[in-house]
Amino acid sequence: MHRAPVGRNAEGQYFMFCFEHVKEYNKGYNFFSGLSDSEVARYQKEAITGHRPTWTVGVNKNAKNGPTQSQTRSGSAGAQARMRDPFGFVSEARARSGRPEPRQRKLKTLEAKAFETLGLGASATTADIKAAYKDLVKKHHPDANGGDRGSEERFRAVIQAYQLLKQAGFC
């Protein structure tokens, strides 16, 4: 059994026919029967947007008549001068002689352990992390320690700590 639509005003309702009768029914079926040409054209136009309401792009009745983005370049000095700064945040930042201290990121438990494994503090730079990693790898490498198991474990811990810090974006 195959479904055949009942009609335009009966969405979700179907006749059940065998395949041959469905083909015959569909030959004579016209979704737009009874509609004028203008109604068919309107339906086809609305079908483009899935019969949802749309608005003309770029039209906003509430927008001020200022320059558009295409008329001003955001990177130009003029655009920065025209920028509204009602709370004075930008002017205060310009007035400061130096940059503010970067906010310290709160370390996760594993990140703190990784820094501890490398013998570093949370404020270590990328260069500090890499230098500590290289020194500890050389110191605890199995070839440098004659196969000492304790040193091998430390070697693995150093590698894991460095990889974790690398994945976390510290180096």
Swiss-Prot record:
Disulfide bonds: none annotated. It comes from the Bacteria. Residues 113-170 form the J domain. Residues 56-83 are annotated as: Disordered. Residues 57-77 have a biased composition (Polar residues). Signal peptide: none annotated. This is Uncharacterized 19.0 kDa protein in cobS 5'region.
